[in-house]
Amino acid sequence: MIPFLGTALGSACVFFMKKSLGDLVQRALAGFAAGVMVAASIWSLLIPAIEQSEGMGKLSFLPAFIGFWVGVLFLLLLDHLIPHLHVGSNQSEGPKSRLGRTTMMVLAVTLHNIPEGMAVGVMYAGFLAGNAQITAASALVLSLGIAIQNFPEGAIISMPLRAEGESKGRAFLGGVLSGVVEPIGAVLTLLAAQLVIPALPYFLSFAAGAMLYVVVEELIPEMSQGKHSNIGTVFFAVGFSVMMTLDVALG
């Protein structure tokens, strides 16, 4: 629930900010979120997945490799099956649909949030299973890191919805609904991973692959478009540093 709280608080910005997010601010927020997700994918998911497969010797990378690619392909499949519209775009993706712009914008961020919920779920599954390499602190750090990047993410969806003409209440609700999938995904992944604990490295790297797909497909283009695109790069580095520090110092 901690990451979902971050989304809700970010979405609440619509009640306190009168104007829509400027392009510069939106690129900074997208860059920060991307940095957090990349660092979380490396330190919280991929490295533990490889470490837990050390018994395989030179093939210890294999579970992480397989899980990573399955995660990428899973998000690619969802991208093609679910109609959605990225913030700031006029061209919808996925199958043709009569859904409104608001609904498709919410669906785009919902797709983004699926791997984040899965990442939290698989970390807690490892902790509850007694995995020595996944502690309560490391699971909590990942939850906090995703909550931190969910705050700007909530604002990124609620503020454009407001700019589209939605009321503040409906814009807030749209932002909140986009994050509901996270606790649901976390619980489902936690239950699935606990049923097949030996496959935990695959689950960890699956979540990493899905998260990095979102970063490359959505956040990097969003943080790099238009003039002053270097602001997105700077905030990417800030987000990466924050998540890396949290994971190494506290995890």
Give the positions of each predicted feature.
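Intrinsically disordered, metal-sensing/regulatory segments
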Residues: 1-251
